[in-house]
C-alpha cells in the first residue's frame, strides 16, 4: 500500500496498474487470498490488476483451482494468458474481464507492432492448447518433474533449494566448488 504514496502528487508518476506474475519467476505461486488482498488494495486506489500468466497453467495445477477462481473471482481485471512456456510457439492471449477496459486496445495492439501479418497462424495454437486440457496436462507434467528434481536435490547436503518448488521451476544454491 505504501507504493501508492505518491498518488496525487504532480511530481510523481501516478500508479495505475498492479501487475503480478502467476506463477512467479522464482517458481512460487500466489495463493488466492494473496491475489484477493492485492486486488482489494489496488481497487481501493482506483488501480487495475493485471496478471502475467506466462506460467498460468502451472499455477492453476499447483493450486488446484479453476481459471475463474484465480482471476476475475479474485479481483484480476486483465490476464495475459501465456502459451509459450507451456508448449505453444510465441502464442499469448490477452483477456479483459471487464469489457469497458478494452477501450483503444485493438489500436494500441496494432500500433505497438504486436499484430503481425498472418497472426491467425500463431493464434490458432491457442485453440489446440486449451482443447482436451492439453495446457493442464503439460503443466501437470512440468510441475511433477520439478517436484521430482527438487526431491532428488534434497538428498544432497551441499545443495539448498532457493525457493519452495510450487510450480515448474527449481532454483538452487550451490557451493562454490560445485559451480567451479
Model regions: which residues?
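Conserved PLP-enzyme active-site core in the AAT-like
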Residues: 1-163, 167-180
Amino acid at each position: 500500500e505504501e507504493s501508492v504514496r505518491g498518488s496525487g502528487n504532480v511530481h510523481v508518476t501516478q500508479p495505475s496498474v498492479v501487475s503480478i506474475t502467476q506463477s512467479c519467476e522464482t517458481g512460487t505461486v500466489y495463493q488466492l487470498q494473496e491475489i484477493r488482498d492485492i486486488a482489494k488494495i489496488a481497487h481501493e486506489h482506483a488501480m487495475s490488476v493485471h496478471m502475467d500468466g506466462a506460467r498460468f497453467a502451472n499455477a492453476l495445477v499447483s493450486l488446484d483451482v479453476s481459471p475463474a477462481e484465480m482471476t476475475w473471482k479474485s479481483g484480476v481485471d486483465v490476464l495475459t494468458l501465456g502459451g509459450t512456456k507451456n508448449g505453444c510457439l510465441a502464442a499469448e492471449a490477452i483477456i479483459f474481464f471487464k469489457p469497458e477496459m478494452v477501450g483503444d486496445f485493438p489500436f494500441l495492439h496494432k500500433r505497438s507492432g504486436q499484430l503481425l501479418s498472418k497472426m491467425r497462424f500463431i493464434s490458432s495454437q491457442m485453440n489446440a492448447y486449451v482443447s482436451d486440457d492439453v495446457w493442464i496436462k503439460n503443466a501437470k507434467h512440468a510441475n511433477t518433474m520439478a517436484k521430482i528434481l527438487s526431491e532428488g536435490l534434497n538428498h544432497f547436503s551441499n545443495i539448498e533449494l532457493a525457493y519452495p518448488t510450487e510450480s515448474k521451476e527449481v532454483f538452487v544454491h550451490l557451493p562454490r566448488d560445485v559451480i567451479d
